Structures are given as C-alpha cells and as structure tokens.
Amino acid sequence: ETLCIYLKRTLDRKFHIRYPNRNEYMHSLFDVISALHNMNDFSILRFDFEDFFNTVSSEYVFNKYISKISLERFQIALFENFVTNTKYAYAGFNTSNILCEIIAKHFDEVLALKFKNHGLIFYRRYIDDGILVFNKRMGADLCISIINEAIQEVFFDKSIAVKYNCKTRLN
C-alpha cells in the first residue's frame, strides 16, 4: 500500500492531474442545459465505459505515457515492477485513479478534437461516464462511432508493445 501511495503521488506531481469534480461538472452541465431552451436544435449523448478500471492496462499506460516523462532510475524500476505485477488498473488500488486519469485525459483531448467540427458545446467525463452536448442534431450512431474511433486511437495504439492490452470499450 505504501508503494502505491508513493507511485500515485509521484505521478500526480509529474502529470498535474486534476481529478474530476462531480459537483462542479453537474453545475456546469445544468448551466448549459438551462440555455438549451433558447436553441433551435441540440443533442445530448451520455456514454460510459464498461468496467473501466479493470480494462486499462497499467503496462500500456506505463509504456505510452509514464516512460516518456523524466523520472529517476529507481522510480522507473519501481513503476516497471509494479505494472508487470498488477497488469491492469484494478479498482481499489491507490494507483488506479491516476493511471486511468492519465490515459483518460488523453482520451478527452482526442475526443474533443474529433467532435470539434460537429457542434460540440459541452463535454465532461467523470471517471468512466461522459456527456456530450451539441448545438445541432447529432445521431447517436455517428456519436458512438466517433467515440469508438477515439477509444481505438488512445487505448489501442499498435505502436505500444505490451503483454496485457487494454480492453476498454463502451458499455
């Protein structure tokens, strides 16, 4: 447990992760929703990841993100040993939130870019749940297809060689 706390704090400092605040997100969403009645058309889509923590490969996150930041040799060795032994960001580990937030932050950036020209006016993700609001009618099938593209790009990068791949997908 002490090792997990140390690793989490190290990653918190290096990645400057801002953990989602559910209350803040809800207030922002309600502000947007209250303005929707003035719009001619809009769409709202909610999505969630299936069994999120248990599908994010800790080895993948290490190889794709953590190994690229400046860490001391002993820290790299600790992380390598940890991700080899844990395989996934299992719910309950102190490191699970940070590992998932590192990759999910990248997912958020990719998703926002993919929806940039589709009238996206609001997007927030709280851990494994996301909500998108558009200023025009957007079909659910198109939205889900674009979300799946972002998932493939972020969680299934073929250039990252790992023993345990991410299994992340929509519910």
Task: Tell where the protein language model's regions lie, with residue ranges.
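Acidic/polar loop patches that form or flank catalytic/metal-binding clefts of enzymes
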Residues: 157-165
